[in-house]
Amino acid sequence: MFISEIQLKNYRNYEKLELSFEDKVNVIIGENAQGKTNLMEAIYVLAMAKSHRTSNDRELIRWDEEFGQIKGKLQKRNSSLSLELNISKKGKKAKLNQLEQQKLSQYIGVMNVVMFAPEDLNLVKGSPQVRRRFLDMELGQIAPIYLYELSQYQKVLTQRNHLLKKMQGNSKNEETMLDVFTLQLIEHGAKILQKRFEFLHLLQEWAAPIHRGISRGLEELEIVYKPSVDVSESMDLSKIKEVYYESFQSVKQREIFRGTTLIGPHRDDLQFFVNSKNVQVFGSQGQQRTTALSLKLAEIELIYSEVKEYPILLLDDVLSELDDYRQSHLLNTIQGKVQTFVTTTSVDGIEHETLKDAKTIHVTNGTVDCEIDRA
């Protein structure tokens, strides 16, 4: 699949923009704070209905405006689709072929993207929240039911935490309601956990050989899910629910005392092992970056295996963060098969066949000054 054009209105520092793209490689060049990352973000938001940079949708709307809009045309193997996302203070509304979608979960996954930005290099050594977000965003693209379960879980979690804070003063009158929320949380949480196990099993199958190739056969990558309760991938759904129920009973008084939910998918984490050593603790910066690169390349192949089309790859100022060897490995892997967007302050120092026929877009202060095709 590839995006052939995009239109922005009141998005970040863009008042109005219409732009067409090549189906292979597009290089967006500009100094820092001129709008190249905003353009890249707009493509991501059009696909995912949320930003990878902020959870505050108001930041996506141009200063002093009431709404922002992103439109795009997506070309898939057997269809051409128009996508539209309208952002206001009241929330987001999505349209597919001019038809408004009742739920964003019906819209997300139509256009698949993989974002690789400098902050993704922190996937290994960053906080558990970074890794959970990675799971949620990537899994949500290929399993719409996961997004539904996740949104329901988060709603119940908010209600349950509010009740737990209320119960810190007097717990006796609210225990029945707490039990109701707990059962709802278990219902959605168990399904989330099961989907994460399935996804990571597939990701492992793709990431391990990719990592082996980048490390020239010297390193073996293993991805390990670290749940907040004693469950395993081999358990069926009913067993996972049973373990959750027992675990919630055991931490009930502690949760009331602390006023928050202490277990569940929102407390889980991922660990990465290279040659049986925890990369987060014992890995070199090179090993951590190889692991992050392996995961991103695995995402591309995993999405292709599930939807039978390659996703759109967004490389936001990340090539300069990779050494020549990893840079070449990345570009060799995607060459000719993945529509790719690259942002950079300069193409100097990036010598690769992939970029020779790229469309070059120069961005200055929220305007596209010129577009040329590199010879």
UniProtKB/Swiss-Prot annotation:
GO terms for molecular function: ATP binding; single-stranded DNA binding. The keyword DNA-binding applies. It is found in: Cytoplasm. Keywords: ATP-binding, Cytoplasm, DNA damage, DNA repair, DNA replication, DNA-binding, Nucleotide-binding, SOS response. The keyword ATP-binding applies. GO terms for cellular component: cytoplasm. One of its GO terms (biological process) is double-strand break repair. SUPFAM superfamilies: P-loop containing nucleoside triphosphate hydrolases. Belongs to the RecF family. The RecF protein is involved in DNA metabolism; it is required for DNA replication and normal SOS inducibility. RecF binds preferentially to single-stranded, linear DNA. It also seems to bind ATP. This is DNA replication and repair protein RecF. It comes from Bacillus cereus (strain G9842). The gene is recF.
